[in-house]
């Protein structure tokens, strides 16, 4: 019977094959080998590679044992065999060995004649799993890159093999050194020193993020370890002042004879300065090359004056640069090794150390710079706070003015705030606060006056979004709360009134779109509702000033709740948010599911109330409405002018050249935003229907003006057409 017939028979009788494979006729070792071959074949097909199980999966490993013994002095070959072993154990050829040494990372490949070739890695492929191999000093000497998925068991196998391999590599190197006549104790000491260096480098890294107090603290740490690292008697660290071509040190021993070089810098700190053209440290700073001098007095760059003054004898010097991105930022000079001269090993150790201490010095320098900037910022903030809060004379002047117990005219939306003087507005703002909260909230009257006056001072003198507008919106909320006293809790009413008074603090007369388009600093701080978030932060800043916290009598919980409500209310004045709030409320009201006691419904109601009060000019008597619209559009035109100056075309509403379209634009604004807002408020609070009625009246008046303007435009166009015909 030929092979084909046997294969056909087995395919037709799979149960017979299965029974035979799992029977005692097949040894466990053979079964396992078959399973490995099957797994490897599956992985190779999946990854588009081919290959067998390999010598490492065979029962007899004597050949591999001989290879390891014969190549024990060849680290690269040992690492290659480890890689092949790992690949064959988990059944994949999709692996790559990356060997690391002082010159960089190299990919290891086996040529057709069996030789190993190293190729510099420029760009590494993305591996599914990377297993590192480290030496006794915990330094990475190789990586095995797997370009196939490994499960947890396979990863454990690879990790175990590489752990044993790392230990084997150590003993292999130890054996090689002994064969060459090296002292094994030296190797142990070298490994201990490497471990010590690694631990310190970790310590330096920690200090960068945790222990940085000042540049001086980091310098002392660097000097102390540099001295211990190479077993030097003394160590000095000089920083480079490239602007003045000098090196300087702030940490020094005045007993070394350097007193004549001591200067006091602009910050009142003592420091030693030398020209970079002088001395050994200057040479290293200028060239970026390290110097290992066995006899200082034989080097012409050495200045022996210091020794003659102090009686100290300099013998050996190791002077090394500290670099960041190839630029020398400092120089460490180590003097007189305790035992002999500085070695190449000392130089190598310091080169590694220099990378980390360069990073530490760089961060410390940044820290010092940030700390100085912070101090300047605090001074500036202190000066700003002084000039942005009201003074004692203003407070005393307002305190002395007597006011009626009740001002009935303030309780209607029709009240004209434009006729109030600059003194009366804050006086009436205080009155409205007291009227609303005198019976339910403990507050200091002087703090309240101070708060209101400072709020006034922090509104900018722009055409519309100024103190007069803030006062008008607060008055609208006052009138609304007086007409619906039970609609909100006292904390909610407090948040609503304070929010209205402060809702446009520090407004610059430009909208959010302008802030984002022009990439202003505020737009970089806040991603959404730019100005509204700034207004809220300004409110909090004022509340935090001494003698301004009108909420200080609240409990901690109530204070947090009130601040949260103030933030919610001020952000709600962003008209971009109104449309989603309107849509949600309309659905709730249309479905007859509105419940003022539900938190979600209350927040939506408060948001729409804020919008209604912010737009209150559209619900004022016609004469107040027209006067307000003039200043609104003047501010719009100012923004449009600024946009045009920067090369951008403003929208028609902000284009001064489209001023004749004002009535038509107002109709769109009144019908598209104002009326829907007041319709919602009237559905929730029928007593506040007057705002809707007044807004409807004003909208019709604007429609009449828009129609008149349209007729004028048509007549003018007709006249121009007739004139052109006459000329022809």
Swiss-Prot record:
Needed cofactors, names only, are: a divalent metal cation
* CDD domains per UniProt: HDc
Question: What is this enzyme's EC?
Answer: 3.1.4.17
Where is a divalent metal cation 1 annotated to bind? 469, 503-504, 614
Keywords, A to Z, come to: cGMP, Coiled coil, Hydrolase, Metal-binding
Active site at which residues?
465
GO terms classed as biological process: cAMP-mediated signaling; chemosensory behavior; chemotaxis; determination of adult lifespan; microvillus organization; negative regulation of cGMP-mediated signaling; phototransduction; positive regulation of gene expression
| Binding residues annotated for a divalent metal cation 2, in chain numbering | 504
The coiled-coil segments of this chain are 691-728
Ranges where the record places region Disordered? 708-728
Protein name, per record: Probable 3',5'-cyclic phosphodiesterase pde-5
The gene name on file is pde-5
């Amino acid at each position: 019977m030929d092979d084909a017939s046997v294969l056909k028979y087995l395919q037709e009788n799979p149960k017979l094959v299965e029974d035979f494979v799992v029977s005692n006729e097949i040894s466990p070792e053979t079964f396992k080998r078959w399973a490995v071959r099957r797994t490897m074949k599956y992985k190779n097909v999946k990854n588009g590679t081919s290959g067998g199980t390999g010598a490492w999966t065979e029962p007899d490993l004597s050949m591999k044992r001989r290879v390891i013994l014969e190549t024990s002095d060849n680290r690269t070959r040992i690492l290659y065999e480890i890689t092949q072993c790992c690949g064959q154990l988990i059944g994949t050829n999709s692996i790559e060995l990356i060997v690391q040494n002082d010159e960089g990372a190299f990919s290891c490949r086996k040529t057709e004649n069996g030789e190993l070739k190293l190729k510099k890695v420029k760009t590494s492929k993305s591996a599914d799993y990377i297993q590192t191999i480290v030496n006794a000093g915990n330094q990475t000497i190789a990586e095995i890159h797997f370009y196939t998925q490994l499960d947890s068991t396979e990863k454990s196998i690879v990790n175990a093999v590489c752990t044993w391999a790392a230990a084997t590599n150590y003993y292999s190197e130890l054996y090689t050194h002994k064969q060459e006549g090296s002292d094994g104790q030296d190797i142990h000491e070298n490994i201990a020193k490497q471990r010590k260096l690694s631990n310190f480098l970790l310590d330096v890294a920690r200090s960068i993020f945790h222990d940085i107090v000042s540049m001086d603290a980091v310098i002392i740490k660097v000097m102390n370890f540099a001295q211990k690292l190479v077993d030097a008697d003394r160590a000095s660290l000089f920083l480079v002042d490239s602007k003045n071509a000098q090196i300087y040190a702030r940490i020094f021993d005045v007993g070394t004879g350097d007193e004549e070089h001591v200067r006091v810098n602009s910050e009142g700190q003592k420091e030693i300065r030398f020209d970079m053209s002088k001395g050994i440290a200057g040479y290293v700073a200028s060239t970026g090359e390290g110097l290992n001098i066995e006899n200082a007095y034989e080097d012409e760059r050495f200045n022996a004056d210091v020794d003659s003054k102090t009686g100290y004898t300099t013998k050996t010097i190791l002077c090394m640069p500290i670099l960041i991105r190839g630029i020398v930022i400092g120089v460490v000079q180590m003097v007189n090794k305790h035992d002999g001269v500085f070695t190449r090993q000392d130089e190598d150790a310091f080169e590694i150390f220099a990378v980390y201490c360069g990073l530490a010095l760089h961060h410390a320098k940044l820290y010092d710079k940030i700390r100085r900037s912070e101090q300047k910022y605090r001074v500036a903030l202190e000066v700003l706070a002084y000039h942005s809060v009201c003074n004692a004379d203003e407070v005393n002047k307002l305190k002395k003015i007597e006011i009626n117990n009740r001002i009935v005219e303030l309780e209607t939306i029709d009240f004209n705030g434009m006729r109030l003087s600059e003194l009366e507005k804050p006086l009436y703002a205080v009155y409205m606060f007291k009227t609303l909260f005198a019976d339910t909230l403990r507050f200091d009257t002087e703090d309240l006056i101070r708060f209101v006056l400072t709020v006034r001072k922090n509104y900018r003198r722009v055409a519309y979004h100024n103190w007069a507008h803030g006062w008008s919106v607060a008055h609208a909320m006052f009138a609304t709360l007086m007409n619906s006293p039970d609609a909100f809790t006292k904390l909610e009413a407090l948040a609503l009134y304070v929010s209205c008074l402060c809702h446009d603090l520090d407004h610059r007369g430009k909208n959010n779109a302008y802030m984002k388009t022009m990439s202003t600093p505020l737009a970089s701080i806040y991603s959404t509702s730019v100005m509204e978030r700034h207004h809220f932060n300004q409110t909090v800043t004022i509340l935090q000033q001494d003698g301004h916290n009108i909420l200080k009598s609240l409990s901690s919980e109530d204070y947090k709740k009130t601040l949260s409500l103030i933030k919610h209310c001020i952000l709600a004045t962003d008209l971009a948010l109104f449309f989603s709030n309107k849509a949600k409320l309309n659905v709730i009201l249309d479905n007859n599911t509105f419940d003022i006691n539900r938190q979600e419904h209350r927040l939506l109601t408060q948001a729409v109330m804020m919008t209604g009060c912010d737009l209150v000019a559209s619900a004022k008597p016609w004469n107040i409405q027209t006067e307000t619209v003039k200043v609104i559009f003047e501010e719009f035109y100012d923004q449009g002018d600024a946009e045009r100056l920067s090369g951008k075309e403003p929208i028609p509403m902000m284009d001064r050249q489209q001023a004749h379209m004002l009535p038509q634009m107002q109709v769109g604004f009144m019908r598209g935003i104002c009326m829907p807002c007041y319709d919602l408020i009237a559905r929730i609070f029928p007593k506040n229907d007057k705002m809707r009625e007044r807004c409807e009246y004003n909208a019709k008046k604007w429609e009449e003006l828009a129609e008149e303007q349209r007729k004028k435009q048509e007549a003018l166009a007709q006249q121009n057409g007739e004139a052109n015909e006459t000329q022809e």
